[in-house]
Design a protein with these regions (language model features):
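Residues at helix-coil transition
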Residues: 25, 107, 164-168
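Short substrate-entry loop that stabilizes the transition state in hydrolases
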Residues: 67-125
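Glycine-rich loops and low-complexity Gly/Arg-rich segments
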Residues: 19-22, 47-49, 110-113, 136-140
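A structural signal for well-ordered alpha-helical segments within the folded catalytic domains
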Residues: 17-18, 96-99, 103, 153, ...
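Extended hydrophobic secondary-structure segments that form protein cores and membrane-embedded regions
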Residues: 24, 85-87, 181, 186-187
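Domain-level recognition of soluble alpha/beta enzyme cores
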Residues: 1-85
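Divalent metal-coordination and catalytic microenvironments
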Residues: 23, 105, 159, 187
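Alpha/beta-hydrolase active-site loop
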Residues: 119-186
Length: 187
């Protein structure tokens, strides 16, 4: 979102808010390779283990979790336009934690959009390999209430940004497999 400064990175006055978004939708069955539950697992293992308070080698077992998700699968146009669900994870969470829910909703005819709330997520890995670490541990901070309010306001703005991008996807202004397949009246 080039219109918002990133307040989690006060050391970089030019930093703009970035979001990582993952999408599930009704798709044509195919034999393409299924996506892993977590991308960049080696990068994520340490922070997942810290959040869960268990040894990091346990987190490496997450690679055994199988999904039904396929990258860029053709849209199943039957049932379109699709109602939309936007998933917002909890503090230290991440978009992939809701994969089974998102897959189920997509199998029922929904387009599901889940984001990492950057710096509130356990760790965000962007397509270029850059990382946004978790920066929301403010327990005991004297201004924790006002900081949490700012975080919630940021999350609301994240969702509003995604909603605006959905309009661009639907219209074709932003190229995406779901161009023309979204029901913007059912979010």
């Amino acid at each position: 979102d080039n219109n918002r400064n990133e307040w989690f990175t006060p050391e970089d006055l030019n930093d703009k808010r970035q979001l990582m978004l993952q999408v599930w939708y009704p798709s044509v069955e195919n034999d393409s390779e299924k996506l892993p539950f977590l991308d960049h697992l080696k990068t994520r293992a340490k922070t997942i283990a810290q959040a869960g308070k268990f040894p990091s080698f346990f987190a490496m077992h997450l690679e055994r979790i199988k999904t039904n998700s396929v990258l860029n699968s053709p849209v199943l146009s039957e049932g379109a336009p699709f109602p939309i669900v936007i998933i917002s994870h909890g503090i230290t969470g991440m978009r992939q934690l809701h994969t089974s829910l998102a897959e189920r909703l997509a199998s029922e005819g929904y387009a599901v959009f889940a984001m990492d709330h950057t710096y509130d997520a356990n760790i965000t890995v962007f397509p270029d390999g850059s990382i946004a670490d978790y920066r929301s541990n403010i327990i005991g901070h004297p201004d924790s209430v006002s900081i949490r309010k700012k975080q919630i306001d940021t999350r609301v703005q994240d969702i509003q940004f995604v909603t605006r991008e959905l309009e661009r996807i639907q219209s074709g202004a932003l190229r995406h497999p779901l161009n023309g397949y979204l029901d913007l009246n059912k979010i």
